[in-house]
Amino acid sequence: AKGERRPEKQLHHERILMFSEGRSYYYTFKPVIDAFLRRGVPFSYITMDVEDPALTIENDLMNSRYIGTGSAAFARAAGRRADIMLSTTPNIGTPGFPMPRPRRVTNLAHICHGVGDIAMYQKGSLDHYDAVLMVGDFMLPSIRKVEELRGLPPKECVSLGLPYLDELAAKARKKEGRSTPPVVLVAPSWGNKGCLNICGPNFLLDLAKAGYDVILRPHPQSLKVETEMLDTIHEMLRDYPNVSFDTEMDATASMSRADVMISDKSCVRFDFAFLYEKPVITLDIPVRNPELYEVADLGVIWEDTVAARLGEVVSPEDFNNIVPVVERALKTPSSAIAAFREESVACWGRSGEAIAQWTVDTLARMDAEHAAEAAATKTK
């Protein structure tokens, strides 16, 4: 049954251990889980979320376990013994984070869960990892620079893509051509870094008056903490039948309809552009508290350097005259976005399989090294 604490098979030592903080990361782990099961590879899966859909998977190859929440769960995860631990969790082992680097895990490997380099990771987030399964080769310079600055040994870095995009690409329905009128999807971040707060909502009114089919998809957190602002926007736009609000958990329906997206620094920009080969208008805003992030040492954020390849990059002032910006963005050729995706994201559509292959190959390499060491000891 869903969320049931199933009896754990008492494995003294696990070869492969997947550690998840919860259901938000299910689509990141699912393609890897599927690949292990297809290959007949046994593994363990631990999660801090009793509602994690992975707990409902019934397969003798998968030893899954709910380990609780909070600091106690992090301690349980850190106490496991494994050859390889696959985790999306940054900050493991950093001062102040509740999970120390697991001492009895030989290879701690990070799976990425968004398109971007490490500039907007908190400082030291990946310092205690042994391997980074990168989205693409573009991540390598920033990882190596941080290692060099801190005198860290070089991690194994291999470009294996983004598994959750496997899952989304399988569901994506790309439409041919452009709708009439064009569909504009507005997907802001929440809080003071979002385009609605920085630019105000009047640009939505301008889009509605211009006759575009406008979809506003608030961030899920906005639905919890910014209800007053959203109520004001509802009231402002209630007389425009060409404006709709999308509060569904799954963004697929809105994304598949849209011809262009307006956003800020949200990673959803890359998901939309790469999945649907449609342009994005990015609001260029400075990073708040950059000293907390790796950008303080790197000096540059990869996502900022490439945002123009998704479409248009604009200032808050440009939102006062948003219609010409939309018209320019709509001229961005799909072929250019597809080419950018191909050069940025490795193993498109088969990342889960690639990560499973890397894991199996790494175990084989570890076994060979152990055998060689044992043979060398025996001949002494």
Q: Where in this protein do the model-derived segments appear?
A:
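C-terminal amphipathic helix plus adjacent low-complexity
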Residues: 2, 308, 314-380
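Nucleotide-activated donor-dependent transferases that construct or modify glycoconjugates
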Residues: 2-23, 186
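Active-site and donor-binding regions of nucleotide-sugar-utilizing enzymes
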Residues: 14-169
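Conserved catalytic-core segment of nucleotide-activated headgroup transferases in glycan assembly
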Residues: 25-41, 163-234, 316-319, 330, ...
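Short acidic-hydrophobic, aromatic-tinged amphipathic segments that line or gate anion-handling sites
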Residues: 64-73, 244-247, 309-319
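Donor nucleotide-activated moiety binding/catalytic core segment of transferases
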Residues: 69-77, 228-270, 275
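Redox-cofactor binding/interface segments in oxidoreductases and associated redox assembly factors
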Residues: 86-87, 110, 134, 186, ...
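Catalytic binding pocket for nucleotide-activated donors in carbohydrate/polymer assembly enzymes
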Residues: 154, 267-343
